[in-house]
Amino acid sequence: MKYIIVILIIIMNLTILSAEEYRIVDSRTGKTLSLQQMANELKKYDLIFFGEDHDNATLHKLERELVPLLDTKRELILSLEMFERDVQSDLDAYIENWLTEDEFLAKSRPWSNYQDDYRPLIEYAKQKKITVIAANIPRSIAGKMARTGPDFTETLLEEDKKWLPDNISYPDDSYKKAFLETLEDMHSPMMNNNPDWLYQAQCLKDETMAESIVNA
């Protein structure tokens, strides 16, 4: 049996106290847990979602400390939103020492905070030969959808269509409402685009990452 950690919502509440400390609370019981206690609880699950503020150093520190505690008897797979499907072969090659780090970074389009926040996870995976999933849709494809709407596939190159998920749905529900409200609160320049297209592009990302995890 394997289990997958997805670096994205965690089932516990994390109260950030400062840049150096945090408190972990089981939202079901209100009980404060140690990191080891949380890891022991999480080991019961096949799929663990870790939601993060991508720029929060404390949460990244927590990720780095948590992953080794989960890497025990069961096969562990790590899935990252940052890496996109078209760089999976490059990610695999780096984990297997077929690419240098410079070659890998040149090919894989990592986020600007990769070195400080994500590199330790990838290096741990490389050391332990843990599978890492490049789960997301290539950003160029999601961007095209955000700019032109759901008919964007008509202008996609055939070589790009292979990165699409088999199914894409756009639920008209509370998720959509919350997504659009968040964009409005952020006063994001993206709102200059059609808000529905932005939502659909997010759904495309969600569907792609979900399918990547299921197929792992």
Model-derived features: positions:
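Sec-dependent N-terminal signal peptides
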Residues: 3-13
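Short, flexible loop segments at the rims of nucleotide/cofactor-binding pockets, characterized by
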Residues: 24-30, 54-57, 109-112, 199-204
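Stable alpha-helical elements in mature extracytoplasmic
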Residues: 34, 38, 58-66, 114-121, ...
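N- or domain-start disorder-to-order transition segments that initiate the globular core
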Residues: 17-45
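A substrate-binding/cap region within the structured catalytic cores of diverse enzymes
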Residues: 77, 89-214
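Short internal beta-strands
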Residues: 77-84
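N-terminal, post-signal-peptide region of Sec/Tat-exported proteins
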Residues: 40-76
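Short, basic, glycine/proline-bearing loop/turn elements
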Residues: 18-24, 46-53, 102-109
